[in-house]
Structure formats: structure tokens, C-alpha cells
């Protein structure tokens, strides 16, 4: 699972000439659902070649490989950089910008679940239960991040209106390794405005909170 889930990011090692091309190519074809569907049967076949005793589990291998690949792209979609999931039909980078690219609050519950599964391998039911708990906690964190992003977006919109700031585009994303403090960048006719907002502010935001 770890190896398959890492495959889409191996495109960073392709020699494309310069950093701009490298950045544009990353999270493109290698992260597109269509190409993942094409690659899945081949990868499942290779796994069964390596583990011939599991040939009778063909459907499970195909499902496992496809889930490992697709969830990789979906997770990348939660970051600010966007992922071209729908190539070759659309090159629009899909991104919800709700989680920083490195966030231990998401990663640690998953690691806890994996470690628990191995530690309690003599008690498989307990290991599986703890693994599911870790996965559930990390998934709830992603759901929370989407809610926090929506809330901050509404706060930013009100604050912009209160300050009579007109923006053509707004970028809202969490600061490193948390989903509490958010950074806001807005594009105006004369330049940019920037600010921060914390979800721990329970009172109604005043104009000085951002901008």
C-alpha cells in the first residue's frame, strides 16, 4: 500500500529541464484518475506475479491498488497546490486548500493505527479496531478542515466588505501544520492584501482582523 501510494509522486524525478516545468508537470498525468484506472490492472498483475499465492484475490488486489492511487490524489487535493485529477479531459487543478502539505495532526492518527496493527498482530481484532480508529480520526480531521476553510472564507468575505476592499481573487489556506490559523491573500486592482485569521477567535471579526 505504501509503495503503490507513493508511485504518483515519482514524477518529481523525471528530468524536465527546469523547476517551472517540473512544478507544472507534478500532480498532472501521474495524479489523474483516468491514467490511474489504466495503470491499476498492470500493477495488480505485477503484485500477483510477486505473490503468486494470492492469484485468487485478483479483485481485491485491483481494488486495493486503485484505492491507494486515488486516495493519493484526493489527499493532494486538500492542499493549496491543486491536482489535475481529471486529465486528459480537463487540466483544471482541483484543490480545496484546507490542509497544509505537511500536517502531523492528520498523519499521526494514521501512523498510530498502522503501528497498533503490527504491535497487536497476535490480537488481530484489537489491531484492526485500533487501525480503524486511527483512520476515522484522520478522516474526521479532513472533514473539520473543510468546515474550517468554509468558515474562514465567510469571515474573510465579511471583513473585506467592512473594509470596502474589492478583490478579484482570494487565496485562503492554513498555515504550517495546523488548521486553526489561516492565511489570506487577496488580489486587488492595485496589488495584494494579506492577513491572518484564527478559528479560536470566538467573537465577531472586526476589520482589523485581516488586511
Which positions does each model-derived feature cover?
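N-terminal membrane-targeting hydrophobic helices
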Residues: 1-154, 158-174
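Generic hydrophobic alpha-helical segments
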Residues: 41, 191, 210-211
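Single conserved hydrophobic/aromatic residue that forms the stacking wall/gate
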Residues: 202-211
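Short, solvent-exposed aromatic-acidic interface loops
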Residues: 197-201
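Exposed beta-strand-loop-beta-strand "reactive/processing" segments of non-cytosolic proteins
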Residues: 168-196
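A broad, structure-centric signal for solvent-exposed, well-ordered loop/edge residues
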Residues: 92-93, 179, 210-211
